[in-house]
Curated annotation (Swiss-Prot):
Protein's name according to its UniProt entry: 2-isopropylmalate synthase
This protein's pathway: Amino-acid biosynthesis; L-leucine biosynthesis; L-leucine from 3-methyl-2-oxobutanoate: step 1/4
EC nos: 2.3.3.13
Catalytic activities: 3-methyl-2-oxobutanoate + acetyl-CoA + H2O = (2S)-2-isopropylmalate + CoA + H(+)
GO molecular function, one term: acetyl-CoA C-acetyltransferase activity
Length: 518
């Protein structure tokens, strides 16, 4: 009998812990809406106790997306965290409190500096309290793969008796190997079914040894009923289990695993592309399922075989995962309906009334200039439109700029707006971008360091749109900025400014430019 595997996506919580991948509230909602289209069963929307911004994002996701998908958020085994989770997710139709507490010796002794019994009691008390708030509670035994098995089981048994409805077994540091992890899940599953066969057994793997997908599939083979993953395998260090790899592994090897998911496969590529666009973190070209070369064949022998029968060298088709529907070609005559459909296919909400009309007018201007508008052009239009909407009085806008470049003294003059104020300054630099960034830094008064600068072409021909991704460091934290424009110097300025605005949003830092620079 085929089992249905529950899929929890934790891109917005665990995935967002990647330096520079932080999203604002609107971006998180945008991505959560796409996860809803993807039809994941549970969205882990964040860690609400960590900041007011994360609390707000989780709350908005629960309110706007939680009508048909379960929403959860992470809590440590303390009352304040559990309260924050409850308050942020309670508007969802099927909310779930997720509690995490370590079980390995190193966690108990070094992290908590308590006895094993004391840590176990912390977990039991946390579950009992969470159950007074909501009926559904998941308990994660952090670092389970390095834990003493009998203590691990003692913890699981105690929290199940306290009311936990899901037990999640994490390979927190990616230490396990597939046969070992599969055996661990088999043993837990065997005991858990005898204890309470209504409790769901889940796994959460990390990719430090490149084994996250293999370990997750081994766990499913050995009785796991739920998997926790991220899109593109996004996550801190080497990343998390890749959702698309697990889902397609179960699909392609259905006879082997005798398990399936509710995920809409045709939304996989679209979801991956949206995440790449929002975070600015590109997928490696040879990444399974979602990489640019995942369905590319350059070998003559392979091409010959494919022409005779695609199944000679393809175990899945690009059409299955939505790769066939990504290329959109629009013209000025495409009309509102076609444009609206194109925007929605790329995972964005189109808005209504005046908002949509303003976006459509921008599309017509671009279509007149470029003649043919592709999917990346639509991405550009929508994100630039959204960015303009989100600018507030304490963030900077680019008013104008001028760059003069020569062999001696490249110079940039920049004028910024912040609310009703304007600021202007000129700087020289080692090239046009350095001069531009030096002028912006002087105006905003923040000592940010440029850590990474990348530029890519997003569309075709001499009118191609360039995308600039930058990463900056401020007070030890990494922030990202990205922008697109047919003028790459302008895109560079906007990306840098977006990174600085991310700093301001994160820190609530209301910087002032020097009076002499105004």
């Amino acid at each position: 009998m085929e089992r249905n595997i529950i899929v929890l996506d934790t891109t917005l919580r665990d995935g967002e812990q990647v330096p520079g991948a932080k999203l604002n509230v609107q971006q998180k909602i945008e991505f959560a809406q796409q996860l809803k289209r993807l039809n994941v069963d549970i969205i882990e929307a964040g860690f609400p106790a960590s900041s007011a911004g994360d609390f707000q994002a989780v709350q908005e996701i629960a309110r706007t997306v939680g009508d048909s998908v379960s929403i959860t958020a992470l809590a440590r085994a303390v009352k304040g965290d559990i309260d924050a989770v409850y308050e942020s997710i309670k508007l969802a139709q099927n909310p779930l409190i997720h509690i995490v507490l370590g079980t390995s010796n190193i966690h108990v002794e070094k992290k908590f500096n308590r006895s094993k019994d004391a840590v176990l009691q912390m977990g039991v008390d946390a579950v009992k309290y969470a159950k007074t708030l909501l009926p559904q509670v998941q308990y994660s035994t952090e670092d389970a793969s390095r834990s003493d098995f009998e203590y691990l089981w003692k913890t699981i048994e105690a929290v199940v008796k306290a009311g936990a409805t899901m037990i999640n077994v994490p390979d927190t540091v990616g230490y396990a190997v597939p046969d070992e992890f599969g055996e661990l899940i088999r043993k837990i599953n065997e005991r858990l079914k005898n204890l309470n066969d209504q409790v769901i057994l889940s796994v959460h793997c990390h990719n430090d040894l490149g084994l996250a997908t293999a370990n997750t599939l081994s766990a499913v083979r050995n009785g796991a009923e739920k998997v926790e993953c991220t899109i593109n395998g996004l996550g801190e260090r080497a990343g998390n289990t890749s959702l698309e790899e697990v889902v397609m592994g179960l699909k392609v090897r259905e006879n082997h695993f005798k398990a399936s998911t509710n995920v809409r496969l045709k939304e996989l590529i679209r979801t991956s592309r949206l995440l790449t666009h929002l975070t600015g973190l590109d997928v490696q070209v040879n990444k399974a399922i979602t990489g640019e070369n995942a369905f590319a064949h350059s070998s003559g022998i392979h091409q010959d075989g494919l022409l005779k029968d695609k199944q000679v060298y393809e175990i899945m088709s690009p059409e299955e995962v939505g790769a066939d529907s990504m290329e959109l070609i629009l013209t000025a005559r495409s009309g509102r309906h076609a444009f609206k459909n194109a925007v929605e296919k790329l995972g964005f909400e189109t808005g209504e009334g005046d908002d949509f009309e303003a976006l459509f007018e921008k599309f017509l201007l671009l279509a007149d200039a470029k003649k043919e508008v592709y999917d990346h052009d639509v991405f550009y239009l929508v994100t630039q439109h959204r960015t303009h909407e989100e600018v507030s009085s304490h963030l900077y806008e680019l008013d104008s700029f001028q760059v003069v470049t020569n062999d001696m003294y490249p110079t940039a003059t920049v004028k910024l707006k912040k609310g009703s104020e304007t600021f202007r300054d000129s700087m020289v630099g080692d090239g046009p971008i350095d001069a531009l960034y030096s002028a912006i830094k002087a105006l905003v008064g923040l000592d940010v360091q440029l850590k990474d600068y990348k530029i890519n072409s997003l569309s075709r021909g001499k009118e191609a749109i360039g995308r600039v991704n930058i990463r900056i460091e401020y007070q030890g934290k990494i922030y990202s900025g990205r922008a697109m424009d047919t003028d790459i110097i302008k895109a560079s300025a906007l990306a840098f400014l977006n990174g600085i605005n991310a700093v301001l949003l994160d820190a609530g830092h209301d910087s002032q430019a020097p009076v002499s620079a105004r």
